């Protein structure tokens, strides 16, 4: 969608920003604008903010690891464009119409499935961060404690966390590895196919979503048990005057989140797009 706005004079100080809000007044995305005098044109790809996805290695040939790079597509409806130029704010309406190439598409049903997958990607992102944080903490405390029994308990906990972590996200770039469930790639793949297609998902896809949601819930339950094991070790850690375990909460995770990157420091969208076509 092209958004045009007029500036009487060139903006010499400060930034120009366009914010897209939905009908509930919620901010969907913020886009940097241009500062030229006269008519300015900014393109919005009609996508919202990407999900806060799980981290892991960038696996060659696997599109699911790019889930944190693509936001959900906005649905047809009325939106508000808020133009901010220095201390001045201007608002105008923006109407997104239905795609004439996809007549009869049930946008409401499609959006429900999209939001479900988005939520699954973010839930997994938080879970992976929590497991990784506690695993790393357990390893550090095991190296620092004097009590041999406590050290053994910490090492066992770290090993359990490591095993769970390996089922949640990719840890090895080699192909053909068997016996490992990697929810990050599997959930991410369904999310990306949903967001890069103009069609409703097939029954096999919705069945797969239900299965992966169940697997995610099982992983969350398993992690919850390990979190309790970690908490039970806190009194012993306190006796040794070491910092105790603290579970990473959602607010802290979201505040400190930065999008995962590949080895080059950025996503290779060209390869990702080839995999999705």
PLM segments and residue spans:
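Hydrophobic beta-strand positions in extracellular immunoglobulin-like domains
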Residues: 5-7, 46, 96
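Conserved structural position at the C-terminal beta-strand
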Residues: 83-85
């Amino acid at each position: 969608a092209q958004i045009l706005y007029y500036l009487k004079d060139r903006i010499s100080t400060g930034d120009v920003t366009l914010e897209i809000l939905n009908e509930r007044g919620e901010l969907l995305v913020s886009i940097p604008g241009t500062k030229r005098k006269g008519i300015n044109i900014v393109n919005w790809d009609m996508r919202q903010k990407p999900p806060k996805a799980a981290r892991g290695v960038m696996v060659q040939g696997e599109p699911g690891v790019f889930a944190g790079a693509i936001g959900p597509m906005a649905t047809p409806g009325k939106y508000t464009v808020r133009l901010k130029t220095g201390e001045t704010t201007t608002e105008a309406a923006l109407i997104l119409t239905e795609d004439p190439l996809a007549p009869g598409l049930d946008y409401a049903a499609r959006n429900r499935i999209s939001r479900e997958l988005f939520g699954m990607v973010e839930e997994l992102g938080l879970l992976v961060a929590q497991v990784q944080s506690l695993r790393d903490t357990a390893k550090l405390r095991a190296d620092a404690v004097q009590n041999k029994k406590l050290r053994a308990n910490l090492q066992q906990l770290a090993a359990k966390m490591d095993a769970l972590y390996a089922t949640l996200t990719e840890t090895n770039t080699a192909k053909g590895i068997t016996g490992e469930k990697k929810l990050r790639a599997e959930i991410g793949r369904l999310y990306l196919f949903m967001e890069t297609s103009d069609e409703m998902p097939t029954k096999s896809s919705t069945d797969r979503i239900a299965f992966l949601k169940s697997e995610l819930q099982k992983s969350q339950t398993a992690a919850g048990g390990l979190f309790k094991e970690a908490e039970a070790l806190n009194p012993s850690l306190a006796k040794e005057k070491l910092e105790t375990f603290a579970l990473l909460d959602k607010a802290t995770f979201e505040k400190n989140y930065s999008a995962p990157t590949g080895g080059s420091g950025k996503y290779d969208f060209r390869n990702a797009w080839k995999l999705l076509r």
